[in-house]
Design a protein with these regions (language model features):
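Signature of the chorismate-utilizing enzyme
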Residues: 1-150
């Protein structure tokens, strides 16, 4: 078994590696900063044909399956449970790797509308919810200047 951070990070930054992986969709880059100004220890790039979950004004997409917009909070939570069953499973704990998979993304404030009665809002082109469960993950360790492919 190779050690987790066995790729040299001297020639690539997380941003340059993210750009090189443009052909792999969906993908994401998580950069971390401590105290608003100092680069934290790890950066993550998720990519590959894992699973994408997106809720927008056209409905809810879980992978290639398209559903109607959930009618209530129960339907939304059930759809997210369904998505978790379909997503690639995170690897068991790998020493030195703080993130090894799972759903990464966001739920906008508008998702609150499934749980609370709020005034109607003008529809946006931005998804109300967008998560990606990547097939592969590059983990940059800024302290050791190593990269792990998980």
């Amino acid at each position: 078994v190779k050690p987790p951070f066995d790729i040299s990070g001297d020639l690539d930054t997380p941003v340059s590696a993210f750009m090189k992986l443009a052909a792999f969709e969906p993908r994401f880059l998580l950069e971390s900063v401590e105290g608003g100004e100092r680069l934290a220890r790890y950066s993550f790039i998720g990519f590959g044909d894992g699973l994408e979950v997106k809720l927008d004004r056209n409905g809810l997409a879980i992978g290639r399956e398209r559903r109607a917009i959930p009618a209530n909070s129960f339907e939304l939570l059930q759809a997210l449970r369904d998505a978790l069953k379909l997503a690639p499973q995170p690897l068991p704990d790998i020493p030195g790797v703080p993130l090894a998979g799972g759903l990464v993304g966001y739920s906008s404030y508008d998702v609150v509308r499934f749980f609370e009665r709020l005034p109607t809002r003008i529809q946006s082109n931005t998804p109300a919810l967008h998560y990606i469960a990547p097939r592969s993950l590059l983990v940059f360790d800024h302290l050791t200047r190593g990269i792990a492919l998980v």
